[in-house]
Amino acid sequence: MIFLFNQSPLTTKKLDTLLKVAPAGTPILLYEDGVLSAKQGTAVSAQVTEAVKNHPIYAVTPDLDARGIKSIIPGIQLVDYDGFVGLVEKENPIPWI
């Protein structure tokens, strides 16, 4: 399974809930506004830095670029759209809404 997260951590606390309930080792894919969670120096940076220790976390590069995010939390893996599709095909995707 892979959790798909596309919401801004600036407008919702759903990332907090996801990180609490996701079983250790379960991948998390950040896309659309969800990539804001990957940015260093935000209110959720410490939480995401800890989460990287227990989960493979991916961020979609074109979504980071579209939002001008250059500095991401170490350990977050970058994927392009083909990588996004590959992860979703490989894992059972669960959208986090």
What are the language-model segments listed below?
Residues R67-I97:
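C-terminal structural segments of small proteins and small subunits
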Residues I2-K14, G34-A38:
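Short, glycine-rich nucleotide/cofactor-binding loops
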Residues K20-A24, Q47-N54:
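Short, conserved loop/helix-junction motifs that constitute active-site signature segments
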Residues I2-L4, L29, W96:
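Structural motif
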Residues K20-L36:
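Short, flexible N-terminal segments of the mature chain
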Residues P27-E32, H55-P62:
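Short internal beta-strands
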Residues V35-K39, D65-I69:
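Short, charged/polar "capping" segments at the starts of alpha-helices
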Residues G41-Q47, L78:
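Charged helix-capping and loop-helix junction motifs
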